[in-house]
Amino acid sequence: MSQKSDLRNRIIFTLFLLVLARLGIFIPVPGIDHDAFYASVEKNTLVNFLNIFSGGGFSTIGIFALGIVPYINSSIVMQLLTKIVPNLEKLQKEEGELGRQKITQITRYLALGWATLQSGAISIWVKPYVFNWNFAFVCESVLALTAGSMIIMWLSELITEKGIGNGASLLIFQNIVSGLPKNFTQSFFDASYSNASLKFGLFIAIFLLMIIITICVQEGTRRIKIISARQLGKSSILDPNSYLPLKLNQGGVMPIVFASASMALPSYLTQIIQNKTLLQILYLFCPNGSLYLLLYCALILFFSYFYTSIVMNPEDIAINLKKMGASIPNIRPGQATIDYLQVILNRLTFLGASFLFTVALIPFIIEKVTQIQNLRGLGATSLLILVGVAIDTAKQIQTYVISKKYDSMTK
């Protein structure tokens, strides 16, 4: 099979699986008054956030409503556990492919448990909208939603293995893109807005500018020069191609995802808590509350440092440099290298978090200026995911083409 046809088949296979994943959202769980439920949750902050990842599945309660969320949550938990539990860390680092397969299997079991819990919570949550709520309905809905989530997880792994790109990321990308037309129409083609065309044009310009800035920051790196013992013996001039790249935004989209999920919780609690004092406190942290933006920025900063500490360990970098016989010019190997890298990472993390602040606040600023109330669905979380997945997929296609060229040259 030729290189072009193989790539084309992978792309077609990926698109086919994405279409299958999308169709399942429109197959409703039986026994629910879906019209009444949709009317009730249309303005719910928590549901709107979850819809970003499910493509509107939480508004319709389709069999694929949970989407890839349980698998992603389980993957995040496993990332944390591999840093905390020594046996899991050893399994990941020292046992090679077999160890990674075991961790993947544990992640799947966690995803199954997570999906079951979420399905049970949803079956209780929709109780007011169920025609005949009983134990049989709970079992049926839990089985349908959990099975749907497991099918999505399977499709995700198929895309990663036999298609092109990362399956989980592409599924989220598809769900976000599917919600953009609705957000645009709700925002700009409502009769209550004056000068809709002008506001639409202004928003498109700002949105494109945000995309350009996001690409620049997502691709931005700090290059730290390194030199090997072999180079040091040959020349005093540093090789410009020998450097350690540290990304400006190490955490990627995860800090803002965690922060957004946390900030959606107060809005959900206001619907189930009756105490007036607690309600007044919770309203301060709701989207229109006086402390919302302050806490939002603080959480983004916290999760940026937290996630960077998980994905980038200065001690591991220093050890690997020592094993390779390389060092940073004018920095002694060992603890001095660790301290130097930690300072650099702290500065980069602060700059990356500041960028996330800016992108996260722009939708709120536009809403205040234009009085358009539906822009947060097009905000920082969605934008960062869209740009990040698009860049990553393009790089994977490029890498695949290059690897195939090398394979054909060596045959």
From Swiss-Prot:
Thylakoid recorded as keyword: yes
Domain of life of the source: Eukaryota
Transmembrane keyword on record: yes
Sequence intervals crossing the membrane: 11-31, 52-72, 111-131, 135-155, 163-180, 197-217, 253-273, 291-311, 349-369, 377-397
Subcellular location: Plastid, Chloroplast thylakoid membrane
Coiled-coil segments on the chain, per record: none
Pfam families associated with the record: SecY
Listed GO biological process terms: intracellular protein transmembrane transport; protein targeting
Cellular-component GO terms for this entry: chloroplast thylakoid membrane
Membrane disposition: Multi-pass membrane protein
Biological role: The central subunit of the protein translocation channel SecYE. Consists of two halves formed by TMs 1-5 and 6-10. These two domains form a lateral gate at the front which open onto the bilayer between TMs 2 and 7, and are clamped together by SecE at the back. The channel is closed by both a pore ring composed of hydrophobic SecY resides and a short helix (helix 2A) on the extracellular side of the membrane which forms a plug.
Subunit structure: Component of the plastid Sec protein translocase complex, which is composed of at least SecY, SecE and SecG.
Descriptive protein name: Protein translocase subunit SecY
Organism: Pyropia yezoensis (Susabi-nori)
